[in-house]
Amino acid sequence: MIKNIENKKISITYEDKNIILPEEIKEKIKKGWQEFKSKNPVLYNGEVTCVNKYESNDTKINISCQKSNFAHYLYDERIGLPLEYSCINISAGALLETSDGYYLIGELDEKMSYPHVLQISGGNVDKKDIENGIVNIMKTISREVMEEVNINLYDNSQVSSLKLKYIYETEQNEKPKVKIFAKANLKITSEEMKNHYNVYLEYLKKNNLEIEFGKIHLLKKNNAIEILENMSNPKREYLIPLVTADLSNC
């Protein structure tokens, strides 16, 4: 479920402490990782920030986090673990809209852990986003957008408005996770964005740098839901609800 959080205070704290898992669970994760790695050798088992406490009311949201690793997260995502041992992921991103009313949707590169999945620009909280035990979620968002599509959210020549606006809270029958989204209106048109990204993509290829989006899709707002529903690519579970929520706020 997508909720508007423009008028809520958000506090995200981080404790530099590993989530405790029983040996049996650790062994399952280890075997699972070996299998995932054999199918996709470029996978990297880096540190992951996981939610261990989430509280929300009408005026504020408090989130507490600890650390685990990508093997734990991926095993839980693909195979599943009991809730008490789950790696409840916290991530953030930005729904980008061009000046002529197109949403920017990224398609993950074939070398990523979820190839060809459609999503907005964003990703997981990183250690560099944490200062004195506080997660700066806007730092996560701006970093990911810069890495993925080479847009500086704080550059007034590129962006006309930026707001922390939405949160995705999983339904009762869904895998628990927390996703926070900003909305950014760009000063460039869809055609300019397409050209901008193509230049950036060539730069990444030329310098042998990581490519997160193999391609981008620019979807006219009034047709975005229909287009997404007709695309055969797998999609992040939040994507259509997020676009629907934003359209209802227009």
Where are these regions (language model features)?
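N-terminal leader/linker segments that precede catalytic domains of diphosphate-processing enzymes
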Residues: 1-120, 124-143, 151-250
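Active-site recognition of the HExxH zinc-binding catalytic motif
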Residues: 147
